[in-house]
């Protein structure tokens, strides 16, 4: 029996409990009828119930899926702590091809597993999943967030995310140039999706000059036309050329891993401030940027606006309250910049220490959510 237990505790060549040592709970979800195979990871509920999206991806094996969900859920703990919201970190992954493996039955089965956690985990859309998928999950559980307005939710999260990027850019300008004005500066924006396009619009309104790149020609033409209406200038460049333009701030709003050994030598900017997730290819690249004299705004601080809206939705949607809370990104980022300089560490280290201090300051776990409680960022009535 002992030998059998020892054998069953292995995943790949690693002991499963060693692999999940930093996490509270891992739930393997298997429903043979619908074909569902999913993993829910709850990293830390010290600050509150776990919050994190559900992505669907054709992972090669369970090891790869587990590795991804462990990494992503831990990241959510720090994101929630950085945003100073009363939630912890969680994430879910569904193993499958989102183009051909989806079905109403699969998402209803997933909803049942989420419901079984009885409020320890709240989830919504992520890469490979849409709200149309979660309409089916909602038939089985109420622990779904990030809901469109027509379903009683708070709607498009790209609005507060973009606003958070603007506050982050203003804070960076204040730190570097002594004024938080956006005008008179040049920004290199990579990606004009839902967030990047809104950021570009606001920068143009402020009188900034832009270098932009995107894989879709129609959005490039659209923002070029906007510049004629709003002022400022827009220069369209090829994808690889965005790294080497002469600008004040690089604003990555598309893919992750773009700050790496190949791109850093090309950068001619004073700072990197954008909404893209996991911008650093490796943690050591924060040091490389630092050595080159380029200020880095940690991505999970910059893009916290969307997370703030998702968390706020659980108290009852309130756009004014969300934007008020999102404004705190300005102050938080300035604190991180100043602390990093004071301690002679990278901004990533400073941000992580700040988050860890927040978590350690909460001595007891708060694994369940109370809808009767007002958020601490509530607008005074």
UniProtKB/Swiss-Prot annotation:
NAD(+) binds at residues 55, 126, 157, 161, 191-197, 214-215, 254-255, 275-277. Pathway: Amino-acid biosynthesis; L-phenylalanine biosynthesis; L-phenylalanine from phenylpyruvate (PDH route): step 1/1. Its EC number is 1.4.1.20. Pfam families: ELFV_dehydrog, ELFV_dehydrog_N. Keywords: NAD, Oxidoreductase. The keyword Aminoacyl-tRNA synthetase does not apply. GO terms for molecular function: phenylalanine dehydrogenase activity. Signal peptide: none annotated. L-phenylalanine binds at residues 79, 277. InterPro entries: Aminoacid_DH-like_N_sf, Glu/Leu/Phe/Val/Trp_DH, Glu/Leu/Phe/Val/Trp_DH_C, Glu/Leu/Phe/Val/Trp_DH_dimer, Glu/Leu/Phe/Val_DH_AS, Glu/Phe/Leu/Val/Trp_DH_bac/arc, NAD(P)-bd_dom_sf. Belongs to the Glu/Leu/Phe/Val dehydrogenases family. This is Phenylalanine dehydrogenase. It comes from Lysinibacillus sphaericus. The gene is pdh.
């Amino acid at each position: 029996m002992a030998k059998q237990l020892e054998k069953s505790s292995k995943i790949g060549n690693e002991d499963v409990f060693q692999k999940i040592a930093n996490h509270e709970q891992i739930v393997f979800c298997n429903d043979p009828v619908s074909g569902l195979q999913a993993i829910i990871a709850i990293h830390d509920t010290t600050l509150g119930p776990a919050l994190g999206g559900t992505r669907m991806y054709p992972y090669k094996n369970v090891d790869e899926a587990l590795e991804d969900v462990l990494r992503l859920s831990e990241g959510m703990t720090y994101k929630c702590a950085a945003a100073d919201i009363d939630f912890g970190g969680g994430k879910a992954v569904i193993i499958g091809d989102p183009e051909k493996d989806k079905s109403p039955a699969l998402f209803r089965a997933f909803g049942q597993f989420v419901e079984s956690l009885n409020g320890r985990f709240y989830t919504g859309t992520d890469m490979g999943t849409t709200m149309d998928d979660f309409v089916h999950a909602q038939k089985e559980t109420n622990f779904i967030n990030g809901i469109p307005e027509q379903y009683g939710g708070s709607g498009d999260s790209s609005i507060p995310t973009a606003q958070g990027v603007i506050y982050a850019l203003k804070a960076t300008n204040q730190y570097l140039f002594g004024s938080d004005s956006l005008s008179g500066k040049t920004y290199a924006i990579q990606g004009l999706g839902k967030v990047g396009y809104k950021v570009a619009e606001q920068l143009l309104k402020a009188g900034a000059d832009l270098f932009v790149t995107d894989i879709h020609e129609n959005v490039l033409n659209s923002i070029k036309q906007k510049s004629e209406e709003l002022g400022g200038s827009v220069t369209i460049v090829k994808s690889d050329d965005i790294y080497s333009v002469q600008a004040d701030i690089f604003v990555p709003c598309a893919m992750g891993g773009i700050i790496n050994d190949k791109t850093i030598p090309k950068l001619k900017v004073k700072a990197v401030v954008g909404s893209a997730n996991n911008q650093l290819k490796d943690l050591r690249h924060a040091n490389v940027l630092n050595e080159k004299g380029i200020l880095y705004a940690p991505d999970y601080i910059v893009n916290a606006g969307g997370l703030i809206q998702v968390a706020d939705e659980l108290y009852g949607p309130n756009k004014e309250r969300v934007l008020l809370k999102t404004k705190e990104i300005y102050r938080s980022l300035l604190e991180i910049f100043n602390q990093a300089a004071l301690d002679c560490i990278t901004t990533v280290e400073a941000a992580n220490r700040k988050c860890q201090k927040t978590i350690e300051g909460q001595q007891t776990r708060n694994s369940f959510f109370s809808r009767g409680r007002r958020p601490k960022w509530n607008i005074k009535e």
